[in-house]
Amino acid sequence: MGRFKSLVDSKEGIENFMVQYRIPPGVGIKYCKERQWHENKQKGEVVIPMITFIEGGMRIPKVTVTRDYLRAYRLAPTQCALNMFRILGFLDTLNEKMGLGLTHYDVNWVYNLLHLKGQGYYLKSWYPEIRLIQCFPDSYKGLNKDFLIVLEEWHGGLPCSTREG
């Protein structure tokens, strides 16, 4: 059992989770453990690690920078490390609150997309002195064991990758 299962183990828990992380009412979610989502996911549904909502600022429907970055690199959320969602979510929040108009191209100017075998894709700064976000925790070990299968109108009408590869 994952660390975050207690947040969504009841109908009331799911409702509270949806309110707290601003998931619209037309979107459904269901919990699954690591390695279990391959059997439970239906066509058109997307699997998103719970930690990306809790620590990474993931929002449904995906906001512009996050959605465009994942589409440009043809990545599904299960292929991405948490730091990617933190950076992309941070840019989406800056755009929303300050109207900066940042895009996924701005991410490419500062970060390089790398793949760590067994861990997924992550963003690494081209230059250590220049970053969009500081103060990442040293490790998220053990926090990526819980997943949500997001169904119904999670994509806001735009095509998004739902499978790896």
Q: Where are the regions a protein language model picked out?
A:
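Residue-register detector that marks a fixed positional context within folded domains
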Residues: 1-165
